[in-house]
Amino acid sequence: MTAMRTISEPENLALGSSLPPGDPHGVSVHLPKWADTVGWASRELRVLEAMKTGYPRFFVPRVVDRLATLLLERQKSELGDRGGNEKQAILLNSAQHARLCREALRRLSLPLERGEPPDIGVYIVTWEGRITPVPPEGVTNHPWRARAVGEEDILLVTFPVDIYLAAKAFWQHTGFGVSSRRAAYWLDNAPFLVPDVAPKALTSPAERVKQLNGGLDALKKRIAAGHSSPSDNLLVSLSDVFLFPAGMAAIAQTAAAIKCLRPEDSPSPPRVAVFGFLYVDTNKVLSRVLGYEAVQYHSTPASLDALEADLEASSRATGADPTATSKRLDLLVTEFPGNPLLQAPDLERLGRLARKYGFALVVDDTVGTHANLSLLAHCDVVCTSLTKMFSGACDVMGGSAVLNPASPYRDRLGRALECGRAEAEERAWFWEDVVRMERNSRDFSERVHRASENARRVAGMLRRSESVSEVYYPLGSPTQDWYDRYRKEDGGYGYLLSIKFKTPAQAVAFYDALDVAKGPSLGTNFTLCCAYTLLAHYRELEWAAEYGVVEDLVRISVGLEETGWLEERVGRALMAAEKLDEARG
């Protein structure tokens, strides 16, 4: 297996270590104790100072931070210091990303004390170090010069320090930020950043083009084949597959394209139904960044009934008064299965509602994967975070959106996404990241099947423990029948599971005693555990609990290790939790 890499002795890793260990581009970080997760969530100095890296959307890579600082200093010296040292900056990959960022920051940020809107600057930084300001109307109309692969311009977005949190939220929710590989490449090779150093022997421009195009083509073929379904008479072509620098970027740009399909003179904001408890940033990118009016539904039959009743009421109101469009639904987003509760929605009924009431149905299959499930024939778009099990190596970011060729949205949505394809695939996704993703994913299906079998065994162990109140896993869940409808003949039940212990103390004891890698992300070749709710919803614990996502939930992304290795470590951690139960008794 080309991408199989596990961690044999994770108990020896220190707090803040990169995951994978020693990898400068690792996309997770080790948080060995429950208290470390609390410390990260509460921004405890002890934990922050130990962090060598982190999940790139939650923790700006230090190499990216260094490049942003240098480019901001250059912007100040060349174009004048508007605001002096009170400015900060983030680095984005494309003009479309910069436009969305400027719009979002102005919408999200409260006016500054002087009563003026925040001064958001957008600048094009070339490989040679030229910096050009871009006016608001010019961000999408800039005549981009052809650039050698790897030397594409970077977008520098500057803002007052007092709206840093809004800018950081944009970075986190969208996945539009430059990658650690792009930043390192610039710091090592851009002529204005290393003027006194002899140039390195770089890969030739022709070879970079060959590697980029070859990688993109191979990825599209792999993804298209995985989503094609002869039993559904569904053949996915390469033109139906769109690639992005992150999974959230795939969701953000798909939702933005759907938003663009609305009439320009529509008097109401776009509306999205969020069905089930979805990944933390999906909700936020839809509402906070893209301006959708979001309606949240539980993933239950009763909530599905409520959704249908709302749609019917809106349809009747619109029929009676054609101008009454405020409740019309444009989009419904769901996960199959959900993260972290692994519930499977009734996709067949959602699809019928989508056709009847005229909204787009987008499914995130990151947890289920196209190796286990055939979902595309039953929705309009499937979005995937390729960062997770598709890569598996935990060292590169990427995302995809695949259009159902039989969808009524195929042509219009395809045209909307096609307009930005070159920018998304050839500019925004750095060529070294594309090459890494292609190499990592060659044995994707084999790894999914192995991890799914390991997870099935671990779920069984956990369900037999007296300290465990509930195990959330598709096999044996109340929604297994819905999962099984779309499970491939050789498909399993996935690599992800979550655990609710009988007491919070038992959850802490289990987590602390479990000798595996611990930190954010999922779908890694090595087993990865996290205190999910603390990482994702620390400042909204009560709201999360309303959906069953309790504060002491433990989530495990099961990896490719030998089954005996896993069972021995999970068994020891369960013993630690069970001892607390015995002590109470």
Label the model's feature ranges.
Residues 237-464, 472, 584:
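Conserved PLP-enzyme active-site core in the AAT-like
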Residues 512-542:
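Conserved PLP cofactor-binding pocket of PLP-dependent enzymes
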Residues 2-249, 257-263, 270, 275-295, ...:
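Conserved N-terminal alpha-helix of the aminotransferase class I/II PLP-enzyme fold
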Residues 569, 573-580:
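C-terminal alpha-helix
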Residues 26, 43-47, 200-207, 416-509, ...:
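Structural motif of enzymes handling amino- and sulfur-group chemistry
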Residues 216, 220-245, 316, 460-463, ...:
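Hydrophobic, structured segments
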Residues 480-489, 531-552:
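Active-site-adjacent capping/gating segments
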